[in-house]
Amino acid sequence: MNVAETYEPTPIIFTDNAAAKVKSLIEDEGNDELSLRVFVTGGGCSGFQYGFSFDEAVNEDDTIVEKDGVRLVVDSLSYQYLVGAEVDFREGLEGAQFVIKNPNASTTCGCGSSFSI
């Protein structure tokens, strides 16, 4: 008798640095209803690109990752490309930015904002 295995995808990782930056930006805005929305769109030099925005709305099919009282929200279409990815915030010589380490991306462009699968 075969037993079916249930596959649970690795969730999106929301790092401490990213959560702290989101918290700081939300405090600056003075609106506790805001969440960081991460999404994938077509475009960029590699075929897909990441996008970030602040959003008050949370849709029924959104995935929510909460950390330290702030939320990261991903729509269901983008989630399939971001399963197992890490959302981080980095400050360096090239500036300060949210970055995504995506194990699903087979190639990325030099700036890291677009990818292909």
Curated annotation (Swiss-Prot):
Iron-sulfur cluster binds at C45, C109, C111. Required for insertion of 4Fe-4S clusters for at least IspG. The lineage of its organism: Bacteria, Pseudomonadati, Pseudomonadota, Gammaproteobacteria, Oceanospirillales. This is Iron-sulfur cluster insertion protein ErpA. It comes from Hahella chejuensis (strain KCTC 2396). GO terms for biological process: iron-sulfur cluster assembly. The keyword Nucleotide-binding does not apply. SUPFAM superfamilies: HesB-like domain. Pfam families: Fe-S_biosyn (PF01521). HAMAP family: Fe_S_insert_ErpA. Homodimer. Belongs to the HesB/IscA family. It comes from the Bacteria. Its cofactor is iron-sulfur cluster. InterPro entries: FeS_biogenesis, FeS_cluster_insertion, FeS_cluster_insertion_CS, FeS_cluster_insertion_RrpA, HesB-like_dom_sf. Binds 1 iron-sulfur cluster per subunit. Keywords: Iron, Iron-sulfur, Metal-binding. Coiled coil: none annotated. GO terms for molecular function: 2 iron, 2 sulfur cluster binding; 4 iron, 4 sulfur cluster binding; iron ion binding.
